[in-house]
């Protein structure tokens, strides 16, 4: 039994590719034209492809249990940097860690963990995403985006000011 989309629904097929031996660079393609390819900095700078498509990674990195276990004792910014480094290969892990510490540090979040997981009762936990400057879950992304966008402009040689509007 499969899923059939109702008439009028626009469903995209994801075009994930197998990572070639020795390949480490992640590219992003447009959901409207797989021939449109770019690196992470260009994708972050653009937001959407020029053809109106979403920019999607060409592959999903494989994460094993050992990788996840190595994240357990680390601070939130380190976890964010390690995971983002799998997708943003044109940024160094050191850059991502700096961005993460700027985005999720005590100047921005009122909890030193940024996104703590609290036990509610046996077998039930709550991920608290309201400790940021606006007390909304979107702070998790919107504190990091300006750092990534500013770096993307530098990496692509653009000298302009970017404005991020969020609702």
Each predicted region: which residue ranges?
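PLP-dependent amino-acid enzyme catalytic core
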Residues: 12, 22-167
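N-terminal amphipathic/basic-hydrophobic helices that include classical n-h-c signal peptides
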Residues: 1-24
């Amino acid at each position: 039994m499969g899923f059939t989309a109702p008439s009028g629904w626009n469903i995209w097929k994801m075009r994930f590719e197998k990572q070639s031996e020795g390949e480490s660079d992640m590219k992003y393609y447009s959901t409207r034209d797989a021939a449109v390819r770019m690196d992470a900095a260009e994708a972050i700078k653009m937001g959407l492809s020029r053809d109106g498509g979403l920019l999607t990674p060409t592959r999903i990195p494989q994460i094993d249990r050992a990788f996840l276990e190595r994240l357990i004792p680390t601070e939130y910014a380190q976890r964010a940097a390690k995971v983002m480094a799998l997708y943003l290969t044109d940024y160094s892990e050191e850059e991502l860690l700096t961005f993460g510490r700027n985005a999720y540090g005590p100047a921005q979040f009122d909890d030193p963990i940024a996104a703590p997981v609290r036990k509610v009762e046996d077998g039930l936990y709550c991920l608290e995403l309201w400790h940021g400057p606006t007390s909304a879950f979107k702070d998790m992304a919107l504190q990091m985006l300006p750092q990534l966008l500013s770096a993307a402009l530098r990496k692509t040689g653009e000298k302009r000011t970017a404005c991020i509007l969020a609702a």
